[in-house]
Amino acid sequence: MNHKVLLINGPNLNLLGRREPSVYGHQTLADIVATLSEQAQAAGVELEHIQSNAEFELINAIHATDAQMIIINPAAFTHTSVALRDALLGVDIPFFEVHLSNVHAREPFRHHSYLSDKAIGVICGFGAQGYEFALAAAIKRLKA
Protein backbone atom coordinates (compact mmCIF):
# COMPACT_ATOMS: atom_id res chain seq x y z
CA MET A 1 0.00 0.00 0.00
CA ASN A 2 1.22 3.48 -0.83
CA HIS A 3 1.14 5.74 2.20
CA LYS A 4 0.47 9.44 1.79
CA VAL A 5 0.45 12.40 4.18
CA LEU A 6 -1.13 15.75 3.36
CA LEU A 7 0.73 18.69 4.91
CA ILE A 8 -1.43 21.81 5.25
CA ASN A 9 -0.10 25.25 6.15
CA GLY A 10 -2.47 28.13 6.73
CA PRO A 11 -2.34 31.90 6.40
CA ASN A 12 0.88 33.90 6.64
CA LEU A 13 3.09 30.81 6.86
CA ASN A 14 4.38 31.72 3.40
CA LEU A 15 6.20 34.53 5.26
CA LEU A 16 8.23 32.19 7.48
CA GLY A 17 11.84 33.26 7.73
CA ARG A 18 10.98 36.95 7.69
CA ARG A 19 7.79 37.20 9.77
CA GLU A 20 8.58 37.70 13.46
CA PRO A 21 11.62 35.39 13.50
CA SER A 22 11.83 35.70 17.29
CA VAL A 23 8.47 33.89 17.44
CA TYR A 24 8.47 31.70 14.33
CA GLY A 25 12.17 31.11 13.66
CA HIS A 26 14.41 31.80 10.70
CA GLN A 27 13.58 28.80 8.51
CA THR A 28 11.43 29.42 5.46
CA LEU A 29 8.43 27.27 4.66
CA ALA A 30 10.36 25.91 1.66
CA ASP A 31 13.16 24.82 4.05
CA ILE A 32 10.67 23.06 6.31
CA VAL A 33 8.90 21.31 3.44
CA ALA A 34 12.24 20.18 1.96
CA THR A 35 13.27 18.62 5.29
CA LEU A 36 9.90 16.89 5.63
CA SER A 37 10.03 15.64 2.05
CA GLU A 38 13.39 14.00 2.75
CA GLN A 39 12.03 12.46 5.96
CA ALA A 40 8.96 11.13 4.15
CA GLN A 41 10.95 9.79 1.21
CA ALA A 42 13.34 7.97 3.55
CA ALA A 43 10.31 6.25 5.10
CA GLY A 44 8.72 5.42 1.74
CA VAL A 45 5.83 7.82 2.30
CA GLU A 46 4.52 10.39 -0.16
CA LEU A 47 4.17 13.95 1.16
CA GLU A 48 1.69 16.32 -0.48
CA HIS A 49 1.85 19.99 0.57
CA ILE A 50 -0.43 23.00 0.33
CA GLN A 51 -0.06 26.45 1.82
CA SER A 52 -2.76 29.03 1.35
CA ASN A 53 -3.96 32.25 2.86
CA ALA A 54 -7.46 31.36 1.62
CA GLU A 55 -9.59 29.13 3.82
CA PHE A 56 -11.56 27.67 0.92
CA GLU A 57 -8.38 26.43 -0.79
CA LEU A 58 -7.38 24.50 2.33
CA ILE A 59 -10.89 23.04 2.60
CA ASN A 60 -10.84 22.01 -1.07
CA ALA A 61 -7.46 20.31 -0.57
CA ILE A 62 -8.84 18.37 2.39
CA HIS A 63 -11.89 17.31 0.37
CA ALA A 64 -9.77 16.23 -2.61
CA THR A 65 -6.95 14.37 -0.87
CA ASP A 66 -6.43 10.64 -0.99
CA ALA A 67 -3.96 10.84 1.92
CA GLN A 68 -4.35 8.54 4.89
CA MET A 69 -3.04 11.12 7.37
CA ILE A 70 -2.99 14.93 7.63
CA ILE A 71 -0.58 17.28 9.37
CA ILE A 72 -2.03 20.75 9.69
CA ASN A 73 -0.74 24.07 10.92
CA PRO A 74 -3.95 26.06 10.59
CA ALA A 75 -2.19 29.25 11.77
CA ALA A 76 -4.75 32.00 12.45
CA PHE A 77 -7.57 29.71 11.27
CA THR A 78 -6.92 27.70 14.45
CA HIS A 79 -8.94 30.19 16.44
CA THR A 80 -11.63 31.06 13.90
CA SER A 81 -12.45 28.30 11.45
CA VAL A 82 -15.37 26.03 12.15
CA ALA A 83 -15.35 25.34 8.39
CA LEU A 84 -11.84 23.86 8.54
CA ARG A 85 -12.87 21.72 11.50
CA ASP A 86 -15.94 20.50 9.62
CA ALA A 87 -13.86 19.68 6.53
CA LEU A 88 -11.46 17.56 8.59
CA LEU A 89 -14.33 15.77 10.32
CA GLY A 90 -16.11 15.32 7.00
CA VAL A 91 -13.30 13.34 5.38
CA ASP A 92 -12.58 11.35 8.54
CA ILE A 93 -8.80 11.35 7.99
CA PRO A 94 -6.74 11.32 11.22
CA PHE A 95 -4.71 14.49 11.72
CA PHE A 96 -2.03 16.12 13.84
CA GLU A 97 -2.17 19.83 14.67
CA VAL A 98 1.17 21.66 14.65
CA HIS A 99 2.15 25.16 15.76
CA LEU A 100 5.63 26.62 15.58
CA SER A 101 5.24 28.70 18.73
CA ASN A 102 3.84 27.70 22.10
CA VAL A 103 0.37 29.15 21.57
CA HIS A 104 -0.42 28.71 25.27
CA ALA A 105 2.38 31.11 26.22
CA ARG A 106 1.05 33.82 23.92
CA GLU A 107 -2.01 36.07 23.80
CA PRO A 108 -5.17 34.59 25.32
CA PHE A 109 -7.03 34.59 21.98
CA ARG A 110 -4.46 32.10 20.66
CA HIS A 111 -5.21 29.57 23.42
CA HIS A 112 -8.41 28.26 21.80
CA SER A 113 -8.34 25.83 18.87
CA TYR A 114 -11.32 24.58 16.91
CA LEU A 115 -9.25 21.53 15.92
CA SER A 116 -7.36 20.31 18.99
CA ASP A 117 -10.13 18.22 20.50
CA LYS A 118 -10.40 16.20 17.28
CA ALA A 119 -6.67 15.87 16.53
CA ILE A 120 -4.68 12.72 17.30
CA GLY A 121 -2.20 15.05 18.93
CA VAL A 122 -1.14 18.68 19.12
CA ILE A 123 2.51 19.72 18.90
CA CYS A 124 3.44 23.30 19.70
CA GLY A 125 6.44 25.30 20.77
CA PHE A 126 9.19 23.28 19.08
CA GLY A 127 9.57 25.49 16.03
CA ALA A 128 10.06 23.74 12.71
CA GLN A 129 11.06 20.56 14.53
CA GLY A 130 7.41 20.16 15.56
CA TYR A 131 6.58 19.25 11.97
CA GLU A 132 9.24 16.54 12.06
CA PHE A 133 7.75 15.13 15.26
CA ALA A 134 4.29 15.10 13.69
CA LEU A 135 5.54 13.41 10.52
CA ALA A 136 7.40 10.76 12.52
CA ALA A 137 4.21 10.04 14.47
CA ALA A 138 2.14 9.94 11.28
CA ILE A 139 4.59 7.54 9.62
CA LYS A 140 4.61 5.28 12.66
CA ARG A 141 0.80 5.10 12.62
CA LEU A 142 0.67 4.50 8.86
CA LYS A 143 3.18 1.66 9.06
CA ALA A 144 1.59 0.01 12.13
UniProtKB/Swiss-Prot annotation:
Residues noted as binding substrate in the record, renumbered to the chain: 73, 79, 86, 100-101, 110
GO biological process: amino acid biosynthetic process; aromatic amino acid family biosynthetic process; chorismate biosynthetic process; quinate catabolic process
Described purpose of this protein according to its UniProt entry: Catalyzes a trans-dehydration via an enolate intermediate.
Transition state stabilizer (site feature) positions: 19
Keyword Amino-acid biosynthesis tagged: yes
GO molecular function terms noted in the UniProt entry: 3-dehydroquinate dehydratase activity
Protein name in UniProt: 3-dehydroquinate dehydratase
Cysteine-cysteine disulfides: none
Catalytic activity: 3-dehydroquinate = 3-dehydroshikimate + H2O
Protein EC: 4.2.1.10
SUPFAM superfamilies for this protein: Type II 3-dehydroquinate dehydratase (SSF52304)
Keyword Transmembrane assigned: no
InterPro entries: DHquinase_II (IPR001874), DHquinase_II_CS (IPR018509), DHquinase_II_sf (IPR036441)
Gene3D superfamilies to which the protein is assigned, alphabetical: Dehydroquinase, class II (3.40.50.9100)
Pfam families (UniProt xref): DHquinase_II
Family: Belongs to the type-II 3-dehydroquinase family.
Subunit field text: Homododecamer.
NCBIfam families associated with the record: aroQ, PRK05395.1-1, PRK05395.1-2, PRK05395.1-3, PRK05395.1-4
UniProt-annotated catalytic positions: 24 (proton acceptor), 99 (proton donor)
Assigned keywords, A-Z: Amino-acid biosynthesis, Aromatic amino acid biosynthesis, Lyase
Pathway as given in its UniProt record: Metabolic intermediate biosynthesis; chorismate biosynthesis; chorismate from D-erythrose 4-phosphate and phosphoenolpyruvate: step 3/7
Domain of life (superkingdom): Bacteria
Lineage: Bacteria, Pseudomonadati, Pseudomonadota, Gammaproteobacteria, Alteromonadales
